[in-house]
Amino acid sequence: MRRKAVLLTVVLSLSGGSAQAMGLLDAWELALRNDAQLRAAGFERDAGQEEVAIGRAGLLPSLQYTYGANYSHSKVTQRDRTLNNTTKRDYDNYVSTLTLRQPLLDYAAWARYQQGVTRKLMADQRFRDRSQDLMVRLYQSWSEALLAQEKLMLLDAQRRAYQEQLALNRRLLAAGEGTQTDLRETEARYTVTEAQRIEQEDTLDAAMTDLENMMGSPLQIQDLSPLALDTLPDNVTENRSLSQWRELTVRHNAKLAVQRENVDYSRYEIERNRAGHLPTLDLVASTRNSLSESEYNYNQKYDTQTVGLQVRVPLYSGGAVSASMRQAAAEYQQSQAELDNQTRQTFAELRRQFNLCANGAAKIRAWQMSVAAAEEAIRATRQSVAGGERINLDVLMAEQEWYNARRELTEVKYRWLQAWLNLRYTAGTLNEQDMMQLAAWFQSAPVINKTGINAATGNKTN
């Protein structure tokens, strides 16, 4: 029922009229259904489920039926001392065989079965990784779009301020109180702002395109619920030390789990090749019907049932088995080295994200103070210009510092949320509850359709 309500809300928010911003959870629900990368991972997982059955088949009985029918024409000559007797034969013959084979001792088949189990587990872990990665990719594109929009708003405000400054410079120049230098400095700043605005428009378009691809629906920036996080919550690292997060990572990180299964797969590959030196033992049972199978049993019908054991002992294969074992052993060492490398990289990324989370609150407070100080600097600089103590360039630089501080404050909030998400993704514990917590830090206005009905509650709005 919750998913149906979410989808109804999303559909109404994407339709025309006065629909308001959708929430991050709504977007996630759509992405779960429509993201091509996740769907591909789902098919890969489904294919991986069959690896166990394929490997198990080598340990189970096999039943085979063969039938052959022919028409034969032969000439039989019998010699005695005085003459040759020739007889012509035209006849039908057939052979029908049903064979049951049950492996009793087949080390290669056992190794292939174990490899099938590891491949199935690898497919499961890859799908879990893609599911968690979808949350990360969705937030990344979501935050990039909102951040680009906020930067555009700041650039628009900055552009308006420069336009006002240009108008003031022109009035002062016309009155003989200004200079061409002041005018050109302001024009240069205004031109740079225009270029930065174009760059942010491109960034916004790219982020919105990524969101549309994930969600499978067209979007406008107005559809996205904005960030509503002024101060960071307490306990951002869940009272866990870095070493505790490392322990979680070893147990739950999907990429490490895939690599460990790959090591096991390589180990069983060694055993599979070792089987080339070992005998196999099969139980074989068959029933065979034949008529005139050859000239020696012409016009004779046989019904034969047999049960027995069949042993195959490899003696020599030109050195291929030994070479294959050496190759598999080298690949096993390679997989272990890749696991070590993946573990080190994962721990390094975990430390980076942990530090970003732990230091996020201090960074946000510092940039909030920087914004407040920049606002005071603008007011003081303008008063000094009016008193003749400062020049036009000082005002432009003070305004630039304020816009830079505002931009950094906005970016550090989004970066902290990204680190909060990445910390749990790297540890392998990222789940739906984390996504719900993340969505709670974004404002999500109720969706109002064209009839004035709140899509979430069903109540009439005034």
Swiss-Prot record:
Involved in the secretion of proteases A, B, C and G. The keyword Transport applies. One of its GO terms (cellular component) is cell outer membrane. InterPro entries: Bacterial_OMF (IPR051906), OMP_efflux (IPR003423), T1SS_OMP_TolC (IPR010130). Belongs to the outer membrane factor (OMF) (TC 1.B.17) family. Keywords: Cell outer membrane, Membrane, Signal, Transmembrane, Transmembrane beta strand, Transport. PANTHER family: OUTER MEMBRANE PROTEIN TOLC. Residues 1-23 form the signal peptide. It comes from the Bacteria. The lineage of its organism: Bacteria, Pseudomonadati, Pseudomonadota, Gammaproteobacteria, Enterobacterales. The keyword Iron does not apply. It is found in: Cell outer membrane. GO terms for molecular function: efflux transmembrane transporter activity; porin activity. The gene is prtF. This is Proteases secretion protein PrtF. Gene3D superfamilies: Outer membrane efflux proteins (OEP). Its main location: membrane. Pfam families: OEP (PF02321).
